[in-house]
Swiss-Prot record:
Location, primary (coarse class): mitochondrion
Protein name: Mitochondrial zinc maintenance protein 1, mitochondrial
Function: Assembly factor required for Rieske Fe-S protein RIP1 incorporation into the cytochrome b-c1 (CIII) complex. Functions as a chaperone, binding to this subunit within the mitochondrial matrix and stabilizing it prior to its translocation and insertion into the late CIII dimeric intermediate within the mitochondrial inner membrane. Modulates the mitochondrial matrix zinc pool.
Subcellular location: Mitochondrion matrix
């Protein structure tokens, strides 16, 4: 196993700790899945393929840290408390303020109905 692969693996494990802190079941499952992926690609010989897999693992780690937020339902209420940490990526609300026609997706498109 190459040094960059080992670094990516350790980074991914740290990312699971940040993303799933306090939820031992999910933490263990995520770590097992990462380990399984690492071991299944252990014997890759093609350097380009190894670099691709390392880059993918680094992307997964970054996604876990920035985009996964845990929530706990408040007892007796219909709302959740989110555990947002300092590394959580908070999006801009500017797209919410745009009209649906300007979003560039199907949100502003007229639906054609079959007759």
């Amino acid at each position: 196993m190459s040094n960059p692969a080992l670094q990516a693996y350790r980074t991914a494990l740290r990312a699971t700790r940040v993303a799933f802190n306090g939820d031992n079941f999910v933490l263990k499952s995520a770590r097992a899945k990462i380990r399984e992926g690492l071991l299944s690609n252990r014997d890759l010989a093609d350097k380009m393929e190894v670099e691709k897999k390392v880059a993918e693992l680094n992307e997964v780690a970054q996604f876990l840290v920035k985009n996964i937020v845990q929530g706990e339902k408040e007892e007796g209420k219909d709302r959740y408390l989110l555990k947002i940490h300092d590394k959580t990526e908070l999006g801009s609300n500017e797209t919410i303020k745009q009209s649906k026609a300007n979003l560039g997706s199907l949100a502003g498109a007229k639906v054609k109905r079959c007759s």
